[in-house]
UniProtKB/Swiss-Prot annotation:
One GO term of the biological process aspect: eye photoreceptor cell development
Protein name, UniProt field: Guanine nucleotide-binding protein G(T) subunit gamma-T1
InterPro entries: G-protein_gamma-like_dom, GGL_sf, Gprotein-gamma
PROSITE patterns on file: G_PROTEIN_GAMMA
Assembly, per entry: G proteins are composed of 3 units, alpha, beta and gamma.
Cell membrane is among the record's keywords: yes
Similarity comment text for this entry: Belongs to the G protein gamma family.
Domain of life assignment: Eukaryota
Membrane topology: Lipid-anchor
Tissues and organs where the protein is expressed, per its UniProt entry: Retinal rod outer segment.
Single GO term (MF): G-protein beta-subunit binding
Pfam families with a match to the protein in the record: G-gamma
Length: 74
């Protein structure tokens, strides 16, 4: 997709672009923010038991666990 410098466009072209964008946006389904937040909260809470950031990673399956023993140079 080519980059368009908006300053190089005529006023008519700018208005046409705006109308095209508004035509795209008018077809989008809109929802109340309160309803979306409620659904999002429910979604997160339903899956929190599977989330490793919430429940943690078992020590035996943790790929980032520090290896025991090492070389100490004195």
């Amino acid at each position: 997709m080519p980059v368009i410098n908006i300053e190089d466009l005529t006023e008519k072209d700018k208005l046409k672009m705006e109308v095209d964008q508004l035509k795209k946006e008018v077809t989008l389904e809109r929802m109340l923010v309160s309803k979306c937040c409620e659904e999002f909260r429910d979604y997160v809470e339903e899956r929190s038991g599977e989330d490793p950031l919430v429940k943690g990673i078992p020590e035996d399956k943790n790929p980032f666990k520090e290896l025991k023993g090492g070389c100490v140079i004195s």
